[in-house]
Amino acid sequence: MIRKHSLGFVASALALAVSAQAFAGTVTTDGADIVIKTKGGLEVATTDKEFSFKLGGRLQADYSRFDGFYTKNGNTADAAYFRRAFIELGGTAYKDWKYQINFDLSHNTGSSDNGYFDEASVTYTGFNPVNLKFGRFDPDFGLEKATSSKWVTAPERNAAYELADWINTHQDGMGAQVNSTLADMAYLSAGVSAKDADDSDGDSVKQFNFRGVFAPMHEAGNVLHVGVNYAYRDLDDTAFDSRIRPRLGMRGIATSGGNDAGDNGNRATFGGVSNSPAGSYKDDSVWGLEGAWAMGPFSAQAEYLARKLKADDNAYKDIKAKGYYAQLAYTLTGESRQYKLEGAKFDSVKPENKEIGAWEVFYRYDNIKVEDDNVVADTATREVGDTKAKAHNLGVNWYVNDAVKISAAYVKAKTDKITNNNGDDDGDGFVTRLQYVF
């Protein structure tokens, strides 16, 4: 029933956006005049900028094929699914209050109990340049996470984030954040979140995030960006899932919503267990570094993170992990990646030629390592010692226009001390995406 009503809402919203084409322009009222824009969704705003309303969305349809380590038996499997299907509603109220609601119809974010919200937040901007944000949103950690999923270069973000997926996902929690730009060359943010998990007393897990970026050059085609990140969560007396289970660039092995490889998908556990009991671990912390440089159509970026899950019982050992990625991208048609200092992030590539669009090629190298000394005996798929993985990502993006993007990427993964059921320690995958945003 919920899905039926959701689809009805989407159809109505799209019909409203289309019908509004006939009314685009300025409407005179007995109060402030209203400006209606229909390029890229439906946007309505008063001329005094006191109020605004924008209806938009994003649709990402993916298809992937993969084999080797990516499947349990090593044979080829595939997956066709909506990676994201967002309806987005945002705007301004009384000039200084901003709101944003993103609902995921593909059910890849959120949950049935808490709603499939990618974001539901309110931001107060009256202390310019300081912003205060409240609600459900992803904590701020990392350049690639700060960049919208619409405009990240590869179909999936880097594998290093999967070493500690809690650092920049809301996990059905609520949070508060303060952020600001400084002297037209820096960005700072700090936040606290109450996650959906509770300790033995029913007190929610608290998480703290900090991100600082220095970007003295921050224009399209002229970017210099360096930053540091820190995330911490208190796990005292908390039972939780401590598994580290990277997908290594192939979402299709196990999607949160939609078709995947089913029981044959191999989302292997590199460290941790599914049911770490209360009292086993005290806290969890992650440090991160990020850097980027762009000149004209060329861009390079890299990130590094190190995690320590600290044991609180002599029966358990600390779990440590570290990882990094390095990425190069070049737009063959000459366009530059856009960049925004507010949020310290890359943005879209805007095609200059409306007939051929913009063509971008990229390469990314991912490398991760997990040290879990709680593993003291070999199993059929995991040896004692540090598990490792590396992945090569080679792909192309075609920005057909401002709304449509088509992507294709080949991923080659190699692991150490961990295999699938067939003994494979490498795998190949190919993923394509059709994206439409409005």
UniProtKB/Swiss-Prot annotation:
The protein's GO terms of the molecular function aspect are: porin activity
Q: Which InterPro entries match?
A: Porin_dom_sf, Porin_O/P
Its localization reads: Cell outer membrane
Signal peptide residue numbers: 1-24
Keywords tagged on the record: Cell outer membrane, Chloride, Ion transport, Membrane, Porin, Signal, Stress response, Transmembrane, Transmembrane beta strand, Transport
Report the record's Gene Ontology biological process terms: monoatomic ion transport
Domain of life, per UniProt, equals Bacteria
The record's SUPFAM superfamilies line, in alphabetical order, gives: Porins
Q: Cellular component GO terms, alphabetically?
A: cell outer membrane; pore complex
For this protein, the record's Pfam families field holds: Porin_O_P (PF07396)
Bilayer topology annotation: Multi-pass membrane protein
Q: Give start-end ranges for the coiled-coil region(s).
A: none
Kindly summarize what the UniProt induction comment says about this protein's expression: By phosphate starvation.
What this chain does, per the entry, is described as: Anion specific, the binding site has higher affinity for phosphate than chloride ions. Porin O has a higher affinity for polyphosphates (tripolyphosphate and pyrophosphate) while porin P has a higher affinity for orthophosphate.
Protein family according to the UniProt entry: Belongs to the OprO/OprP family.
Name of the protein this chain belongs to: Porin O
| Organism of origin | Pseudomonas aeruginosa (strain ATCC 15692 / DSM 22644 / CIP 104116 / JCM 14847 / LMG 12228 / 1C / PRS 101 / PAO1)
Traced from the root, the source organism's taxonomic lineage reads:
Bacteria, Pseudomonadati, Pseudomonadota, Gammaproteobacteria, Pseudomonadales
